[in-house]
């Protein structure tokens, strides 16, 4: 059931291995990258309690030893204090340029560990072993690393490609239903932005995938990663097509900032709501039929996911404040917001030609339902 997706970036190319049981094979797969048979592992306390011993055994089976630092779980870890702690620990471990750092966790750990590897000694190689669905299909692939700033999400970082990604789909079985569905928000995004047939497949197979069907999970992760790999190979540093991967994220990042990057709204939940809002905005601008946002919301609802601002607990700021929060988005060019909109399911495109009033109206209507 193992699948391999190749990310073609010349000298920085690497493989993404996908399937159950990869943690047990970690040593054999990572050893060829190592000048000395040891790795420094950055993880979080939740993942460490569930999977760290399995990783230690998997590495040892390939003759590789490890030291590990477990950081607190959650988005609040992705900031300067824990980043400094991780970087100091890596220096304490005497990690050299020829060594490999292993990011073992979800998107927060992958982003932080990758950024630490990018700047440590001006660049150390790293391997991603993503343990959440969101990280397996999105953040572990493509080389975006970084941390959050007081001004907004992911504003401090670097492009630093991993040397290998091991996506063990068996660990997805240990995720809470909420965390799994948050990751599913990113899976749906791929169908919505460029593969209508994949969205059709998800409408049929989504329930089996959520229920634990391993073949369906491997297929969903593989198709998602393949689409991302193809886009990254064309546009590694987000000068063009790669911005399509941010479908739903302009709304999402504003909502995450408005909820204090807290458990009120997980990133993947924000992406799902953001995709629904992006399709609603597209329909109101006459770019796609009203049937499309209805279909998007219907599938998300059928999967038991958040689809509207009403699904976010607690108070939200006004539409004006939310639009102002969008102005801190990384996709802003010359002060203009760039939106990813759609001419239909699977037909996303990037545009700066979106009237502020149209965005305000969509948000005001969504807030009025709260």
UniProtKB/Swiss-Prot annotation:
* Enzyme Commission number(s): 4.2.3.4
Q: How is the cofactor bound?
A: Binds 1 divalent metal cation per subunit. Can use either Co(2+) or Zn(2+).
Top enzyme class, one word, equals lyase
Write down the required cofactor(s).
Co(2+); Zn(2+); NAD(+)
Answer yes or no on keyword Phosphoprotein: no
User: What is the first-listed, main subcellular location in coarse terms?
Assistant: cytoplasm
Please give the Gene Ontology molecular function terms for this protein.
Answer: 3-dehydroquinate synthase activity; metal ion binding; nucleotide binding
An annotated GO BP? amino acid biosynthetic process
- InterPro entries membership: Dehydroquinate_synthase, DHQ_synth_AroB, DHQ_synth_fam, DHQS/DOIS_N, DHQS_C
Q: Where in the cell is it found?
A: Cytoplasm
| Record-level GO cellular component terms | cytoplasm
Tell me what reaction this enzyme catalyses: 7-phospho-2-dehydro-3-deoxy-D-arabino-heptonate = 3-dehydroquinate + phosphate
Cited CDD domains: DHQS
- The answer to whether keyword Lyase applies is yes
The record's listing under Pfam families reads: DHQ_synthase, DHQS_C
Pathway listed for it is:
Metabolic intermediate biosynthesis; chorismate biosynthesis; chorismate from D-erythrose 4-phosphate and phosphoenolpyruvate: step 2/7
Q: Which residues bind NAD(+)?
A: 107-111, 131-132, 144, 153
Q: Which UniProt keywords apply?
A: Amino-acid biosynthesis, Aromatic amino acid biosynthesis, Cobalt, Cytoplasm, Lyase, Metal-binding, NAD, Nucleotide-binding, Zinc
Residues that, per the record, bind Zn(2+)? 186, 249, 267
**Family statement:** Belongs to the sugar phosphate cyclases superfamily. Dehydroquinate synthase family.
Q: Its function? A: Catalyzes the conversion of 3-deoxy-D-arabino-heptulosonate 7-phosphate (DAHP) to dehydroquinate (DHQ).
Name-wise, this protein is 3-dehydroquinate synthase
Gene it is expressed from: aroB
């Amino acid at each position: 059931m193992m699948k391999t997706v190749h990310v073609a970036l010349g000298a920085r190319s690497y493989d993404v291995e996908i399937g159950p049981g990869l943690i047990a094979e970690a040593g054999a797969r990572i050893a060829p990258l190592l000048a000395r048979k040891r790795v420094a592992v950055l993880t979080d306390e939740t993942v460490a309690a569930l999977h760290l011993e399995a990783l230690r055994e998997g590495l040892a089976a390939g003759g590789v030893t490890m030291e590990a630092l477990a950081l607190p779980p959650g988005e609040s870890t992705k900031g300067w204090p824990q980043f400094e702690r991780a970087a100091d620990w890596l220096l304490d471990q005497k990690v050299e340029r020829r060594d490999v750092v292993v990011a073992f966790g979800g998107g927060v750990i992958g982003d932080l560990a990758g950024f630490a590897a990018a700047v440590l000694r001006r660049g150390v190689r790293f391997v991603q072993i993503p343990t959440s669905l969101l990280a397996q299909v999105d953040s572990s692939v493509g080389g975006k690393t970084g941390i959050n700033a007081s001004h907004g999400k992911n504003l401090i970082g670097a492009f630093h490609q991993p040397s290998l990604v091991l996506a063990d789909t068996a660990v997805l079985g240990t995720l809470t239903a909420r965390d799994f569905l948050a990751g599913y928000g990113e899976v749906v995004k791929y169908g919505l932005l460029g593969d209508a047939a994949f969205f059709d497949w998800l409408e049929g197979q989504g329930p089996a995938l959520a229920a634990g069907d391993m073949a369906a999970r491997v297929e969903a992760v593989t198709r998602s990663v393949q689409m991302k790999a193809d886009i990254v190979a064309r546009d590694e540093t987000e000068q063009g097509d790669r911005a399509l991967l941010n479908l739903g994220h302009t709304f999402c990042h504003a909502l995450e900032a408005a909820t204090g990057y807290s458990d009120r709204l997980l990133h993947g939940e924000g992406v799902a709501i953001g995709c629904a809002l992006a399709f609603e905005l597209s329909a109101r601008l006459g770019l796609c039929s009203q049937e499309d946002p209805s279909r998007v919301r219907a599938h998300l609802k059928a999967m038991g996911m958040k689809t509207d601002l009403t699904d976010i607990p607690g108070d939200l700021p006004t539409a004006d404040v939310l639009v102002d929060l969008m102005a801190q988005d990384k996709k802003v060019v010359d002060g203009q917001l760039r939106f990813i909109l759609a001419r239909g399911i699977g037909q996303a495109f990037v545009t700066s030609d979106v009237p502020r009033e149209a965005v305000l109206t969509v948000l005001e209507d969504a807030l009025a339902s709260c």
